[in-house]
Amino acid sequence: MSYHLSHILKVAILLFLVPLKISAQSSEVPLADPYVLLYDDIYYAYGTHSNDGIEVYTSDDLVHWKNAGLALHRRNTSQTRWFWAPEVYHIHGKFYMHYSANERLYVAQSDSPLGPFVQLGGPLLQNLLGDTYCIDSTVFVDSDGTVWMFFVRNDDGNCIWQVQLSDDFLTPVPGTLRKCIAVSAPWENIWPRVNEGPSILLHQGTYYLTYSANSYESQDYAVGYATSPNVLGPWEKSSQNPILRRTEGLLGTGHHTFFIDRKGELRIAFHAHSSASAIHPRAMYIGTMEFTHEGHLQLTSQPIVRPKLIAKP
């Protein structure tokens, strides 16, 4: 298998199906929009959960996790609410957290993956877009070293856009902003109009732009992908979509990120509802991905990992 994954710097709606009932488990890792970083042989998980900032969890095996507290506390930011969808990258000896707060994009820096992270500057796209709604950023380094940020902007619903970043991984390059994808497929038309939570893979010369569609509140929140021979698109959505939806009794499966585990396998971290009758809490789950001979991206037959939270002594 040959692929390239850049990690230098990534109300319930019941329609036609009666889902399996899932009991909320206090031992789950309560992260939505999860992101997993492997650093020095330890897994670090970040996500949406706390009103006070961004939590971090650690694990040796992807199954058992410890809550290591707040990696980013709101006192170290200019914002006070809606800390969502963090991704952490190790760059030149520092750790950079891309995240959204109050529906704007920010970057914070730390000397440790555990934090404390401190906000750098103001909203990342303010000079380019002004004070406008932007969430769900992910950073991708192309094979030629060019840095791209994919993110979500509201334009007739949540749509995915991209912009080039300078070598500092922080400064948007003027003239490079472009729209990538928007709601277009029948399976994506369950209220509201959403394409969000982007992530990028490069496999054998093809770029895979993965995303989530439908409301996160819906049991039909799901993951799909689009491909292009060029990082600038145009993007063609796969006929195999959605590739992650209501799997193994899990509902509302979405807002994923990818990472390479210790064995070199391509893994996907995503969230799902813990209950068939409530949106919250959402919890983190981990699957294994593969590319078929035809170039399709799909889940393998390996069971979904259901991370467990180790109680504090």
Positions of PLM-derived features:
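Carbohydrate-active catalytic/glycan-binding domains of CAZyme proteins
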Residues: 22-313
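Sec-dependent signal peptide recognition
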Residues: 4-14, 21
